Amino acid sequence: MGKLTDRVAIVTGASRGIGRAIALALAAEGAKVAVNYNSSAAAAQEVVDTIIAQGGEAMPIRANVSQADEARSMVQQVIERWRRVDILVNNAGITRDRTLRKLTDEDWSTVIQNNLNSVYYCTTAVMPYMIEQKYGRIINISSFVGQAGNFGQANYAASKGGIIAFTKTAALELAKYNVTVNALAPGFTITDMLAKVPEQIQEQIRARIPMGRFGLPEEIAKAVVFLAADGDYITGQQINVNGGVYM
């Protein structure tokens, strides 16, 4: 039996990259996993099929979690299937990188809506069930950019910094119900997003990282599993998984 046997988890943005790795890692420890996606149905189904092939239980759920009604509907579908929700991983996010001089109002609001508002919508959707259960683990995927800032990413930095502040307040309010709320702040991680960066720029970024390499999605997933399975007395914290790029 795994550390998370019979636990029910929702992972947003779970069809690829870090979200995919998190979904697979939670399932490997026995959790039943709702694999959320917005547009990548085939990729989400592949994650579900992989989990089932390994003896686990999972289902795909399409929801644009930047919309309150869709986030709540997603949670309701999980409750209808598995009667509970124990773990929420708020991972879904986007970028629209431009310097402040070129950033549009739409660039700003779209990133805030997708990255920050989605965390609020999903968290408040699972809260009543976790409070009733007297158990819950909420893990929000932030970024070192929310701590250090990054050129051309004012909107992204604000959204990820907001996640950290939200995490601390939610942790204060939910601790008495045995619901922990923590944030993970990854550094530069090998994902589709990083793959789009020109190789020359990647080398410049890698040179900034004390450990001399990019992170792996699986390394982020290991930290999520730790918080979900063993982090009973950890709440309101931001945990950096970044190779030392920000200390």
Model-derived features with residue positions:
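Conserved glycine-rich cofactor-binding loop
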Residues: 8, 15-16
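Residue(s) in the substrate-gating loop at a strand-loop-helix junction
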Residues: 143
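Alpha-helical segment proximal to the catalytic Tyr-Lys
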Residues: 128, 172-173
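C-terminal substrate-recognition "lid" of short-chain dehydrogenase/reductases
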Residues: 127, 135, 213-241, 246
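Short, small/polar-rich loop/turn modules that mediate ligand/substrate recognition or access, typified
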Residues: 175, 180, 234-236
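Substrate-binding pocket helix/loop in short-chain dehydrogenase/reductase
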Residues: 99-100, 107-112, 194, 205
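Active-site helix of classical SDR
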Residues: 123, 159, 167
